[in-house]
Amino acid sequence: MKKNKLVLMLLMAAFMMIAAACGNAGESKKSNSDSAKGEEKASGSLTISGSSAMQPLVLAAAEKFMEENPDADIQVQAGGSGTGLSQVSEGAVQIGNSDVFAEEKEGIDAKALVDHQVAVVGMAAAVNPDAGVKDISKDELKKIFTGKIKNWKELGGKDQKITLVNRPDSSGTRATFVKYALDGAEPAEGITEDSSNTVKKIIADTPGAIGYLAFSYLTDDKVTALSIDGVKPEAKNVATGEYPIWAYQHSYTKGEATGLAKEFLDYLKSEDIQKSIVTDQGYIPVTDMKVTRDANGKQS
């Protein structure tokens, strides 16, 4: 009798061990499944176009995103803010980048677009280093771009004719510069180039040349960024509103962002990217700004 009882107890113990093992295997399988789900990578194709001022930022972020998500393909094209707004409105691209609010562009149905402000960019008047000028007043800047001051010697610089280098009317960089540097005054005729990289090269290669560039293009000594009324074109001065020439970097979608577009925009606005790529590329995180602006240019 005792022998039978012992056998029964051993069988029960064995059964309990098997049941426990099965339970652990089930939990392990579930855990592995949840882990795989959490590590799911983004995939698909995304086309972005627009602002050349934003291009260095978006390119750098897209490259890192694709490194982390090998099945995602992101194409970043420039063309200017007007192009970005038009193409996203037409559905030709999923994201349209712009230095200006959609409300500021004629022919754009701003109500159909959703604004994702991913950064702030400062812009500066940039001159050929041989001009001999590093700081001018805002009034002098307006006189240069409206053709009233024609030689750098009038400002204490070298005896060199001033050559203006402008962006086309579709450019958000031009719109921002005209609005906040020139107080709405239209620039005089000069060289007009669509690409910020080309503008920088012309300024660097042409004695007496002056144009305007986003801070993201002012990363070396090939051109000189001018201070305005003693205020240097630096991120900290943009953040406080002391330096006036800046713009939000808008990434617009037609309706709410979905799929890969949403994943990339969330990535671009994440704290990790804002504190690394955004600042490394010469932009300012929106969260660092002590002032705000609306579509009418009102600062508060």
Swiss-Prot record:
Residues 27-42 have a biased composition (Basic and acidic residues). Residues 1-21 form the signal peptide. InterPro entries: PBP_domain, Phos-bd, Phosphate_ABC_transporter. Gene3D superfamilies: Periplasmic binding protein-like II (3.40.190.10). A lipid is attached at C22 (N-palmitoyl cysteine). It is a lipid-anchor. Belongs to the PstS family. Part of the ABC transporter complex PstSACB involved in phosphate import. PROSITE patterns: PROKAR_LIPOPROTEIN. GO terms for cellular component: plasma membrane. Residues 27-47 are annotated as: Disordered. Keywords: Cell membrane, Lipoprotein, Membrane, Palmitate, Phosphate transport, Signal, Transport. A lipid is attached at C22 (S-diacylglycerol cysteine). Pfam families: PBP_like_2 (PF12849). It comes from the Bacteria. One of its GO terms (molecular function) is phosphate ion binding. The keyword Membrane applies. The lineage of its organism: Bacteria, Bacillati, Bacillota, Bacilli, Bacillales. GO terms for biological process: phosphate ion transport. This is Phosphate-binding protein PstS. SUPFAM superfamilies: Periplasmic binding protein-like II. It is found in: Cell membrane.
